[in-house]
């Protein structure tokens, strides 16, 4: 039985106190949650401290909370911030554990079967296990997740029921414990002691939980009774202290007992017979042979090992679900009365909606051509309506809430005031006639003041032509296009901040990590061309890029005023008016945000000094040199992950993949 520690409240630690309109936003959100309001929107302008407000709300309502972001980088940033705010509570990180993932697929036009290929990040796998075990053991839990949280995970009941509970004085033989550990997918390894392993030394069993990376546990027996349980350092074996209760959760999230396994195998065999009969009646003999061979091999592995590669494709049978029934996900590990917060909801909710369709199209092809049983279709992400069925209470957080969020609630809490006193930028609308000369004059003014400029265009050709023109005019300019890899992108932003160049041109400059305080001018070309990047939401996001500088200014070049432009201008003016009034009433003088400039990632070669990426010619490196570079990067990636700098770790991961693809 798992003893759930449910009496520990969230304790927020911060040197800041709520300011601006944060107190009003916090109070409104908390009152609405405690009053039973199901959905509400926190409409927070860029730079107003939305994460701090979210933390205050969590500490006051005291509910287990799931925070969902739309990519790993943002999830990592939020995780780091919440860890600082709640050092005494369980702040967990749950994203896809693949550094690299090529899903299983079949392309009938070329008769090409692509086998699943992946590289699992051990650190993230540990954090995923830490998240699920924390949810089952305690209530003071915040899980920061990507949309991976809506993918199938295995039954929380099986996961909890399979847990091994140990106490000093408990009557259990050493061999019984060893068998129980094997049943929950722990491996015996007396040499290489790592996560998900155990080792045996006489009457002493040492176990390394899947959710830990530095600490393991030593269980000492006296006959058929546990004499003592100690927490130890996994590397040195040094005792940290005694524990009075140890719960060991399975080493994999897909786990089942022997009885359920045989029932599951019987269902798999029945489905196989049915599908083989269908293929043979349609004359699809190759597909039938392919399916029989693969499925029978998987069944043999399940019987002998309790696990097989791709076991998740049989999850419907393992979980005892009906066809079409949604899979268990991370959301099922939470208690019923939990809180969901959706960060950047205008992006994240769109992702949640789109995950299901893409997954089904790929898997249907595998089923049609005999690579998988039809039940594989039920190993899938949740549909949006299935996600909604898990929602007890939800807060959508965005500077520009989407239509979906607005349709879910009329309760909108605004957070417009920035603690720094910074205002939303002033906006000019100018004719596109003579825009190049006008823009050049504006850029030169910024260069003279050591400030930077963003220019956003709608087409690649326009961006390239503008880059060439500005270079001819003597402007230090760069164009950031979609082919640029993550690490190069980070270097470009860094060089812009350092003044290596003064102007950055791009098509979509809304992506994360583009907040540059040195930017005082944002120029929007073709502002009157309605579409994804020129709708009201896209324009407000782009305008926000100039809201980090006290001299922030936006110029829209257009031949007519569109409805989207007018709404974006009106909304910005409304916010600016509120901000000016607040600053005047409280004697606040706006100041440009001060933000440290992170150094470049460098790769240490054995016989050379540290060499940054831009100084290295990877293509001219020998295979051996590239291997050394990869090994050095992997070490630095692990160090970054241990320091909870997942943004840096993700950049290193991307560079490692680039290097591997060169071999």
From Swiss-Prot:
Residues 1-10 have a biased composition (Basic and acidic residues). One of its GO terms (molecular function) is excinuclease ABC activity. ATP binds at residues 44-51. SMART domains: DEXDc, HELICc. Residues 1-23 are annotated as: Disordered. It is found in: Cytoplasm. GO terms for biological process: nucleotide-excision repair; SOS response. The UvrABC repair system catalyzes the recognition and processing of DNA lesions. A damage recognition complex composed of 2 UvrA and 2 UvrB subunits scans DNA for abnormalities. Upon binding of the UvrA(2)B(2) complex to a putative damaged site, the DNA wraps around one UvrB monomer. DNA wrap is dependent on ATP binding by UvrB and probably causes local melting of the DNA helix, facilitating insertion of UvrB beta-hairpin between the DNA strands. Then UvrB probes one DNA strand for the presence of a lesion. The beta-hairpin motif is involved in DNA binding. Forms a heterotetramer with UvrA during the search for lesions. Interacts with UvrC in an incision complex. Belongs to the UvrB family. This is UvrABC system protein B.
